[in-house]
Amino acid sequence: MFFTMTTPHTIAIDGPAASGKSTLGKLLADHFGYIYFDTGVLYRALTYVALEQAVDLADAAALAKLAQTSNFEVLPPTIADGRQYTVLANGEDITWPLRAANVERNVSQVAAQSAVREALRDIQRQIGKAGHVVMAGRDIGAVILPDAQLKIYLDASVEERAQRRAQELNARGRSISYREVLDDLTRRDAKDAANTFLAADAITITTDGRSPEEVFQAILGLIGVEAQA
């Protein structure tokens, strides 16, 4: 793959849960002065609202209608409490509740509904069309932003991802074991497989044993080398 510019205007990052997409996305967005948008928060937000309103998570039509009638906003951080962004659902700040155990357990089921994905894709594409954005998800490079100038696919073993996620959750005050997280990620991988796509022109990076900074520097190096080729 060769780029015609050193700085891509649109960056797509895909990969399985806890592979480092959010961390890398934020680093790249900060470096280039771009917006960072994690599309997973939309599915989490919809899952949260559906659970709050006791909507049947197996009812694709009801979920799609809820997605269309709800007002979801992803904003820059409004509170300095470690968040990377603020998520509002119908005006309510739900940023941290999105990481609750019940949302974690059910988001893959919600995201697997094709009607739901279609209902939320327009929001994602509109954000991407504006440019100067780093967007992370499962199908960004292949489906949402197929014309993105830089496409990255992050991968890591489920064991590595479980270790990272367990450390992250425990650091936030949620007591959870590595085994619990490993089992949850294994289930999520199975559910997410049908909606996780590797774009043909994506750069694949395996992040096992590599720090976020090492992955970030590797991406910058690849951009520089290919831009000059």
UniProtKB/Swiss-Prot annotation:
> Which species does the entry assign this protein to?
Herpetosiphon aurantiacus (strain ATCC 23779 / DSM 785 / 114-95)
Question: Could you give one GO CC term from the UniProt record?
Answer: cytoplasm
Gene name of this polypeptide: cmk
Q: Where in the cell is it found?
A: Cytoplasm
Give its E.C. classification number: 2.7.4.25
Binding, ATP: 15-23
Protein name, UniProt field: Cytidylate kinase
**Entries under HAMAP family matching the protein:** Cytidyl_kinase_type1
What is an example of a Pfam family matching this protein? Cytidylate_kin
What reaction does this enzyme carry out catalytically? CMP + ATP = CDP + ADP; dCMP + ATP = dCDP + ADP
Which GO molecular function terms does the record list?
Answer: ATP binding; CMP kinase activity; dCMP kinase activity
Query: What CDD domains does the record point to?
Result: CMPK
Q: Which GO terms describe its biological process?
A: pyrimidine nucleotide metabolic process
What lineage does UniProt assign to this protein's organism?
Bacteria, Bacillati, Chloroflexota, Chloroflexia, Herpetosiphonales
Q: Cite the entry's keywords alphabetically.
A: ATP-binding, Cytoplasm, Kinase, Nucleotide-binding, Transferase
User: Which family does this protein fall into?
Assistant: Belongs to the cytidylate kinase family. Type 1 subfamily.
